[in-house]
Amino acid sequence: VINSTACGLIQEARRHPDKIGKVFAGRDGIIGALTEDLIDTSLESDEDIARLRSTPGGAFGSCRYKLKSLEDHRAQYERLIAVFKAHDIGYFFYNGGNDSMDTAWKVSQIAEKMGYPVVCVGVPKTVDNDLPLTDCCPGFGSVAKYVATSIREAGYDVASMSRTSTKIFVLEVMGRHAGWITAACGLASENVGE
């Protein structure tokens, strides 16, 4: 899902060269932006970018790094704006879940305070499906299908056990405190009331 989003974003940016010159991807997310480890996607062919749509994983890497508060860690934000200025970055798209949306917001706040004109956009992607005001986050549909299929197959396996076997099956799924993935297991039922 994250590669499909990157593909769509890069392809759309290429359709508007008057607005967006180059698209840089931060290697391993915000860490790449902070360390100026940027991937210039303009060096990739249209065909290679199109292949992202069906490439699993995250082609540009990822991280679980939450920006600290602006008040306590202003230097990291100033560094980020310096990188944006050095590469004439006018749009900042950040793909991910809750922490990524928080990062996009924090970057927009410091850019405004520092007078740097950058449009910051949080691009939702989370299997947890727990972003406010978002009905279904990209990523959730894939995991919902996978979990429902897995629970149905496990159910068939448990049902095939002999009468003298213990028929208990426990499946732990991701989703933090949201419960959407657990609820998706209900899609495995074949009959009303199961």
Pin down the residues of each PLM region.
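N-terminal phosphate-binding or glycine-rich loops at protein starts, especially the Walker A/P-loop
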Residues: I2-D37
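Short glycine/serine/threonine-rich phosphate/pyrophosphate-binding segments
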Residues: I2-L9, A33-L34, Q76-E78, N98-K106, ...
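A generic structural signal for alpha->beta connector loops
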Residues: I20, P56, P117-V118
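Short, ordered loop/turn segments at secondary-structure junctions
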Residues: A25-I31, R64-Y65, G97-N98, K106, ...
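Glycine-rich phosphate/pyrophosphate-binding loop at beta-loop-alpha junctions
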Residues: A33-T35, D128, P138, G193-E194
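Glycine-rich oxoanion-binding loops at beta->alpha junctions
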Residues: T35-G90, D99-S100, P138-G139, K145, ...
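Accessory alpha-helical/coil subdomains and C-terminal extensions
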Residues: V83, Y94-G96, D102-P117, V121, ...
